[in-house]
Each structure stands twice: as C-alpha cells, then as structure tokens.
Amino acid sequence: KSFYLGSYKVLQEIKKKVLDFWMKFPNKFLQGTQNVNVSGNYIYHSKDVKNSFLVRDSQNIHYSQYIQELPGSKDCWDFSIWGENSELVYESHSCGTGVQNLKFCVLCQENVHDLEYCLFCIKGSENLFGCIGLRQKQYCILNKQYSKEEYAKMIEKIKKHMNEIPYIDKKGRVYKYGEYFPDELSPHGYNETLAQEFFPLDKDEALTQGEKWVEPAERNYKIDFEINS
C-alpha cells in the first residue's frame, strides 16, 4: 500500500493511525538486560539506576541519559552524555573519560577532577572554579592561578557570596550556589537548542517561562545562474 506524504495533514493522519495501531499491543516496560533495581529505558548491565535512559555498565545513576561509554560510570546525578569511568558527576553535560567530582560542568574530560562551573577544561586539570579552556592546571578561579591555600579561602568566600547575594532572573527565580547557569544567560534561543527536541514549546510558552526565542531570518535568495541541461 502506498501513502501520499506530500501533505502535512495526511502525514498527521497516518501518524495517528500508526499510534492507534501500536496501542493495541502490549509494550515492553523496559528495554534492557542484566539489571538490578533500575527504572527508565535502554539500560544494560547496571544497578541502582533511577529514571535514566541509555545507560550501560553503570551503578547508582539518577536522572541521567546517554551514559553508555565503557567502562561504566557510577554515583552520578543529572548527567547527560558520555561517562566512560566517570564518578561523582552532578548537573553536567558532555563530560567523561576518568573524570571525578564535577559539578555544573560542560565538555570537561580526560582525568579532570574537582571542577565546578567549568567549560572545556581537560587533561588532568583539578581544583578549578569558573574556568574555561584550561589544560593540566590546578587551583584556578576564573582562569587566574592561586596557591592551594589561597584557592581554599577564595572558594569559601565565593560560595558564601553566591548564597548571600544570589543571581535573580527576570522571572524572580533565585540562583544560589549549587544551581546551574540561568537559562536567560544563554546566547541561544530556546528554539535553537536541543531542548526544543526533547521538551517542545511554542513561542508564547517559551517566553512565559523566561526563555529566549529567536525568529528565523528570511532567506529568499535570488537564483542568479542556470544549469544547462
């Protein structure tokens, strides 16, 4: 049987028929094998995993996804993408390969540890706060080098300040130490990010939630050449 897929209306009708057909049959509660105490989907050879997806050979993972690289990871919470022998990762994205004790980090990798609010820090870096693009560095705050003793004192002062005078966004939401970066600081519109793929919002919904929205620019290019047949 053939279907005409050139019409959006027809395509939506076909999708509804397919979904109605699927609902007539039992659905497996979880895709996975050799697990103990897990919830979510596509979980394999893991233990104590809660509400997570695409996890493999890992233990004590909560609210995480795409943690599939081997060897597995453990003791991670709100962690998206990668893993590979990662431990104690919290609210971080695209981090992995022997990383440990990361909080609020993005794209930090290759045996880094004890990092907070960092981006693109790699190759064995440790004890960094609010740093970008450092390699084999330690005891830095906002990319500035400190001694071990100075670092400990400054971190204590910074966290105290973040709690006493927190960032407050346009919607009145309070961001103390321990919160991820506010969405309104993102240079991208909600509709330009992967968030729109997983949690779709229309423009009004996004703006109501305090997100940015970017209207696509019109690109009516004039064809100025022809291909001779």
Can you name each region flagged by the protein language model?
Residues 1-229:
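Long, distal/terminal scaffolding or interaction modules
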